[in-house]
Amino acid sequence: MGKNLSLRQDDAQHALSANTSSAYNSVYDFLRYHDRGDGLTVNGKTSYSIDQAAAQITRENVSWNGTNVFGKSANLTFKFLQSVSSIPSGDTGFVKFNAEQIEQAKLSLQSWSDVANLTFTEVTGNKSANITFGNYTRDASGNLDYGTQAYAYYPGNYQGAGSSWYNYNQSNIRNPGSEEYGRQTFTHEIGHALGLAHPGEYNAGEGDPSYNDAVYAEDSYQFSIMSYWGENETGADYNGHYGGAPMIDDIAAIQRLYGANMTTRTGDSVYGFNSNTDRDFYTATDSSKALIFSVWDAGGTDTFDFSGYSNNQRINLNEGSFSDVGGLKGNVSIAHGVTIENAIGGSGNDILVGNSADNILQGGAGNDVLYGGAGADTLYGGAGRDTFVYGSGQDSTVAAYDWIADFQKGIDKIDLSAFRNEGQLSFVQDQFTGKGQEVMLQWDAANSITNLWLHEAGHSSVDFLVRIVGQAAQSDIIV
């Protein structure tokens, strides 16, 4: 599925105007958060789509299946070296991996096999391996090396292919479990050993590269763990934290080489609080946890649970989108081809945006804005003054209508301001006149349900319906 387009975002005549409310405008803006590709220019650079970025990151066209072989699975071996006669680069001062490094490297390997058709089997002793791990401490001249971080070699049939090397003088390399940058480094170097390149033509130790050298706009940690450049270059903010698993463009890139792993999390998965994923980067146990991830999920009915945060959050369930979670910006994304059905906000003033699936959105405490989009959605505002936004007749049809499950009369609002662009809306009491742009509230006292109907201009029949648990008044509707 693509991004939810029912909020009139593809129609110039429905651009933001004085006709639409601040709640509608906040959703409209959020749906354009990190728009990419399609000829856009961002930061003075060409913007790449996910597929374009994946092609760029795999431009060497090498994998463990050979050259120019795409979408083919691979069963690989890995090894933690115990001793070496030499290091391919000429560096010296070999040190074998410590227990903490081994643990973190295995988690990095797991994060790659979660998203692509890769299996990793550890070997020991004299057995050779596709991917190897070792530390160094000195450069080729025997001097202590404090400048470099790590490096790795692409797949192939040459001496050193698939080997990865880490500077043991760096504290985040020696203790990667306590310093997020160490885990990020392991995942980055394993990416190279699997065939992924940097998004641009740069390398450590070659001049003084910067984001100015980026080939395309989305070359940052926000989009790729293979990047050199901080997430702030593309408008995100991780507040000094680092991601430790493949990001949205990395997932597309590694799947281009080895195919997508369609056995990963096929059940009902929860990401964030109350997570059942058994992955540390998908799991929050308290509000201090900085979640930085791109989700890959192969099936089931899945939930983003960000209920433990008190920050104002923006949560978008559309594939390819980014969310602002737990006080960070642009820190959670959804990989291409993934459907997340449900979202739970926290106690701040949140914006929740659904996709074309039948979503369950729960705002929680705070003054929240909920937009379900297409599909038959169930919306819970929770405590606070909440606004339920509708952008077009496609958002809640007679055949697939939304439920607003906890509406508070006189407190919550239902926002129909987007429909003003077709002409001023007016209320009718018992039946429509046929003129269009008419709204009718129908109270079902026996079941304590309000039916909200809307007949749009230019439509031969009434095809917009929202069902509301509880009674709503005309003053609760923004028209």
UniProtKB/Swiss-Prot annotation:
Protein name per Swiss-Prot or TrEMBL: Serralysin C
Binding site for Ca(2+) 6: 373, 375, 377, 395, 402
Residues involved in Zn(2+) binding: 188, 192, 228
Main subcellular localisation: secreted
Subcellular localization(s) per the UniProt record: Secreted
EC class (word): hydrolase
Co-factor note (free text): Binds 7 Ca(2+) ions per subunit. Binds 1 zinc ion per subunit.
Active-site positions on this chain: 189
Entry similarity comment: Belongs to the peptidase M10B family.
Proregion span(s): 1-17
Catalytic activity, as annotated: Preferential cleavage of bonds with hydrophobic residues in P1'
Source organism superkingdom: Bacteria
Binding site for Ca(2+) 2: 300, 302, 339, 341
The entry's keywords: Calcium, Hydrolase, Metal-binding, Metalloprotease, Protease, Repeat, Secreted, Zinc, Zymogen
One example of a Gene Ontology biological process annotation: proteolysis
The keyword Coiled coil is annotated on this UniProt entry: no
Residue sites binding Ca(2+) 1 per the record: 265, 267, 297, 299, 302
GO cellular component: extracellular matrix; extracellular space
Ranges in a coiled coil: none
Binding site for Ca(2+) 3: 346, 348, 350, 363, 365, 368
SMART domains recorded: ZnMc
Sites where the protein binds Ca(2+) 7: 382, 384, 386, 412
